Amino acid sequence: MGQIFSRSASPIPRPPRGLAAHHWLNFLQAAYRLEPGPSSYDFHQLKKFLKIALETPARICPINYSLLASLLPKGYPGRVNEILHILIQTQAQIPSRPAPPPPSSPTHDPPDSDPQIPPPYVEPTAPQVLPVMHPHGAPPNHRPWQMKDLQAIKQEVSQAAPGSPQFMQTIRLAVQQFDPTAKDLQDLLQYLCSSLVASLHHQQLDSLISEAETRGITGYNPLAGPLRVQANNPQQQGLRREYQQLWLAAFAALPGSAKDPSWASILQGLEEPYHAFVERLNIALDNGLPEGTPKDPILRSLAYSNANKECQKLLQARGHTNSPLGDMLRACQTWTPKDKTKVLVVQPKKPPPNQPCFRCGKAGHWSRDCTQPRPPPGPCPLCQDPTHWKRDCPRLKPTIPEPEPEEDALLLDLPADIPHPKNSIGGEV
């Protein structure tokens, strides 16, 4: 049984392996210009043909769409032939850069096989990205975002910096296919970019909207509310299209690098008071922001996005995620950090028992608290005495010598200079 392909295609179909991202975006842009729009079957046949074309030795870099059209078999299924025809026409309309004049060479050109002479330097060509244009005929109908659509778009721009050509081409394709309102574009910005990039984009968009409202836009009625509110109406297609162009143009003021500065990584500690965290942010922004950059929008954004989870829940519950800083401080002033130290639980003492102790036979205490020593389980293995333990056996104690008699002790106290009687020859004593 054959496969069934639906008419609703993924917002950004995945490119075939081996094809550059900007080339695949050109194929997608040409496919979205078809009337009626492309289906999943058309994208499937396009990827299948590109896989075969990339394996042929006749592949040229940059891609030559006329050569690809000559490689397409006759009667190939799908609308690949129409897609290549649109690319050939668009490539012919884009003026190519003039080639640099050939370098002056001496009369005797060195042979190409000479290993001592390097080949001439060829300047690498920049990736050619076709401009995004809306298809001919009726504009696309508005469709709200779904989570799978946002995930597919974020996966495509994960390696590209905000404002880069690949990033803008992917975003334009998504805007062209879904025709989002101002609320949808705000949700897309918060899902794709960091809080810092979203704050900078919001500042640039506000200035562009103010300039456009002053200049005047076709279909804009100042009495009906701001341009952002009127662009949320799905029936205002022309006015919504103007807002989409302003929203895309606001990315031009973003830096080319997606790396956030050091003050963007300041986070609130688990037990840090909210006002101390905001004070640290304020000092870091004063020392790190370039001159002329507004500080309040960035401070409000970081005060919510970099706060801990408990403060974020308080701000979100009271609707102060992007409110003035004073309201955010008042919302979190009653919050106190939880004490994380362990509290020793003191168990209440049990009343003394009425029964007698198993050891001493007296009442008023438990046997584990008895002061009387525990009796031995049996007689001593040394002396067979059942009243003491082996460690207390008298046989293990050293013997103390007996004291000398009292007479000997008295003799020791006699003076030593008394002369002893001697027997002489004369018989004198």
From Swiss-Prot:
Changing S105A: 70% loss of viral particle release. The modification Phosphoserine is found at S105. The record marks L130, P131, L344, V345 as: Cleavage. GO terms for molecular function: nucleic acid binding; structural molecule activity; zinc ion binding. Pfam families: Gag_p19 (PF02228), Gag_p24 (PF00607), Gag_p24_C (PF19317), zf-CCHC (PF00098). A zinc finger (CCHC-type) spans 355-372, 378-395. PROSITE patterns: ZF_CCHC. Keywords: Capsid protein, Disulfide bond, Host-virus interaction, Lipoprotein, Metal-binding, Myristate, Phosphoprotein, Repeat, Ubl conjugation, Viral nucleoprotein, Virion, Zinc, Zinc-finger. GO terms for cellular component: viral nucleocapsid. A motif (PPXY motif) lies at residues 118-121. The keyword Ion transport does not apply. One of its GO terms (biological process) is viral translational frameshifting. A motif (PTAP/PSAP motif) lies at residues 124-127. Residues 93-144 are annotated as: Disordered. A lipid is attached at G2 (N-myristoyl glycine). HTLV-1 lineages are divided in four clades, A (Cosmopolitan), B (Central African group), C (Melanesian group) and D (New Central African group). This is Gag polyprotein.
